[in-house]
Amino acid sequence: EEVKDENTVIEKTIQSENIKLKEKIDKPINTKVLPKVSIAEQYKYAMNIMKSGDFEKAEIAFKEFVDTHSKHELAGNAQFWYGETFYIRQLYEDAAAAYLEGYQKYPNSSKAPENLLKLGVTLAELGEVEQGCKMIVNLKKAYPKTDASILQKSSYEKKRFNCN
């Protein structure tokens, strides 16, 4: 019952943010960068671009991956990393839009809890501290089996943004 209430809080917050961020999600990207290899190899290729520090090219690669393989088990992870390409460059509106899309489209992905956390953090970075804190504070209730490392990050972010 309590988890359902917390998820309702998150959903209401997301609905209000969704209106503001919707136009950011549909940014057209025309470039294709992924090689014609297996899906797993394409994901690995995109991750290697990310690790190399070419975040603009990684943005294109992860977007292409998600657009092409939206039903694949790695799509949720790719969506998270797509958001990270923006966050690293401090493009917080684009990052928030990507994390929001990841949370909504891939709620059962292994990256879903981190998507929710980073959505909260980016909202707080954008000055929407109250909304961001709702995401951060409710993370454990929304995803009770979250990794300890993500809960630790959540704790840190609660303190950083003075969340109650």
Language-model regions, residue ranges each:
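Acidic, proline-/serine-/threonine-rich low-complexity intrinsically disordered segments
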Residues: 1-45, 49-50
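Short solvent-exposed coil/turn linkers within tandem alpha-helical repeat scaffolds
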Residues: 68-74, 105-111, 141-152
